Amino acid sequence: MKAFIWTLSVLFFLLMGIGHGRGRQFKIKKITQRRYPRATDGKEDAKKCSYTFLVPEQKITGPICVNTKGQDAGTIKDMITRMDLENLKDVLSKQKREIDVLQLVVDVDGNIVNEVKLLRKESRNMNSRVTQLYMQLLHEIIRKRDNSLELSQLENKILNVTTEMLKMATRYRELEVKYASLTDLVNNQSVMITLLEEQCLRIFSRQDPHVSPPLVQVVPQHIPNSHQYTPGLLGGNEIQRDPGYPRDLMPPPDLVTSPTKSPLKIPPVTFINEGPYKDCQHAKDAGHSVSGIYMIKPENSNGPMQLWCENSLDPGGWTVIQKRTDGSVNFFRNWENYKKGFGNIDGEYWLGLENIYLLSNQDNYKLLIELEDWSDKKVYAEYSSFRLEPESEFYRLRLGTYQGNAGDSMMWHNGKQFTTLDRDKDMYAGNCAHFHKGGWWYNACAHSNLNGVWYRGGHYRSKYQDGIFWAEYRGGSYSLRAVQMLIKPID
C-alpha cells in the first residue's frame, strides 16, 4: 500500500514538474524571441549591434548570460532545460522527503487509530461486562430478599408448630392424668366386680352345690408324638409382639373381665384378588392360587364379605373362619359381635356366625382345625362335614366324623347351640361363656375352647380353665399358641 501511494505521489509531482518546465520553456522562448529576434539575414546581423542582457529568473540561482555571439537558440534552449530539470529534481527530492515524513505521520496516525478502535472495542466490552455484573448483582439482591422472606416465613411456621407442640404436650399430659385416673377407676371396678362375682357364686353355691362347671382332665390320655398332616402357615400374617413380653403375663383386664358391647368391624384392606366368588375354592378354580384376602359372596347372601383364603395347604381352597395367633383381639364378646364378626383379616379374627352359616349351607363342606403349641408342634383335627343351622336355631353346630392326630375334642360340642355372655344356650345350669371367657358351642361346658383367653407360655393358672385349649391335646390347663378353623367344599 505504501509503495502504491509512493508511486502515485511521484507520478503526480513529475506531471506537475513537467507542466511547470514546459510553461517556463515557453515563457523563456517568448522572452528570447522578443528580446533576441532571429536574424533574417546574416548580412543584416552584421550591420546591427549586439547586446548582452542579464535577465533575473525565479528559482534560478545565478544570472543567465545570454550571448548572441557564438551561441544559437538551440544551445540556449538546452541549457535552460537542464537547469529546469535540476531544479525539478531538487523539488522532487524535497517533496519525496516530505512524502516520507507524511507517510511516517500517516503510519503513526494509523497505529493511533487502531489503538483507539481497540480501546473503543474494549470499552464496549467492559460496558457489557459491567452491565452483566450489575444484573447479576441485582438478581442476587432480589434472591437474598426472597430468601430472607422465606426464612422469616419458616421461622414463623416453626414458632407456630412449636406453639402447637407445646399445646399438644400439655393436652397429652392432661390426657395421661385422665387416663391414669380412669385406669385406677377401672381397676377398682374390676376388683369390685370380682368381689361381687365371688359373693354371687358363694350365695348361689349355697343353693346349688354343683354350680362350678366341670373341669376337663389336666393331661389328656395320649399326646401324639408326630403327625402325618402338614399344617399350613399358622400365624403367617400374625402381628409381631415384643419378644421381651413376660411369658406368664396375662392379657389386660379388659380382655378378660368384660365383654365388648359393640361389634368390631373389619377394616377395609387392599384386595389381593378381585371377586366376588362364592368361596375360596371357587376363587382357586378361577386361577387364584395365592393366599390372601378375597372378596367372597355366598349364594344366598345380600352382599360380599372379605375373608382370608388359605392356599398353602394342599390342595388349597380353604376358607378361614377363625384364627388366633397373638392375643391382639379380644374374643370375650356379646352375641351381636359373634354374629357379625370381628378382628383383623390378616391377623386374629372371627368371620361371624351369619357369614359362616351362609357359606356352609350353599354346599357340602368339611372342617379342618389346626393347633400349634408353644414348642412349635402342630397337630390337626378334620371333620368330614360341617354346617351351621340358622339364627333361629342359635347357629347349632353339625359335624361329621373325625380324623387327625390332635384327638377329638369337638364332637362333644356337636349338635349344641352357640352361647355368649348375653345369650346362654348351653346345657349347664350357669353360663359357660362367663366361665370360659368366650363364645362357643358349649355343652356343659367345654372340651375345647378355641375362643378363650390367649395366655402366653402354654400352662396357665386360672380358676375356670378359660384359655385356648383342646382337651385331647395338652389338656384344659394349657393355652395353645395358635389355632385356626378352615372349611372347604367336599371333593
Curated annotation (Swiss-Prot):
This is Angiopoietin-related protein 1. It comes from the Eukaryota. Keywords: Coiled coil, Disulfide bond, Glycoprotein, Secreted, Signal. Pfam families: Fibrinogen_C. InterPro entries: FIB_ANG-like (IPR037579), Fibrinogen-like_C (IPR036056), Fibrinogen_a/b/g_C_1 (IPR014716), Fibrinogen_a/b/g_C_dom (IPR002181), Fibrinogen_CS (IPR020837). Residues 271-491 form the Fibrinogen C-terminal domain. GO terms for cellular component: collagen-containing extracellular matrix; extracellular space. Residues 80-168 form a coiled coil. PANTHER family: FIBRINOGEN ALPHA CHAIN, FIBRINOGEN C-TERMINAL DOMAIN-CONTAINING PROTEIN. Residues 1-23 form the signal peptide. The gene is ANGPTL1.
